[in-house]
Amino acid sequence: MANSLLEGVFAEVKEPCSLPMLSVDMENKENGSVGVKNSMENGRPPDPADWAVMDVVNYFRTVGFEEQASAFQEQEIDGKSLLLMTRNDVLTGLQLKLGPALKIYEYHVKPLQTKHLKNNSS
């Protein structure tokens, strides 16, 4: 009985969402910010190392973390900083609730770091 109950619970767990594909829009960006928008252009997201603070904020707003995105702005996290963040930085340094912080790190920060390393190691 307990096993079937657990199986039912775990059957409801969804896989993490995939990262949206992004493109760069440099027009009308007087503050030096790289515009981030959903797109399949280039077949991959632009290098997050080039993102300004507002690009990081807009990325997290776009992927559904509207409330938490402001923490990246308050802490002045640009793309280079984002790529250097550890799990502990996200869980404690941004002063976010644990649930969203875990999702932000596991489903977004870590994959962005992995893609950046993969794209820049070859």
Swiss-Prot record:
PROSITE patterns with a match to the protein in the record: SAM_DOMAIN
One Pfam family of this chain: SAM_1
SAM domain residues: 51-119
InterPro entries the UniProt entry points to: PcG_chromatin_remod_factors, SAM, SAM/pointed_sf
Protein name as it appears in the record: Sterile alpha motif domain-containing protein 13
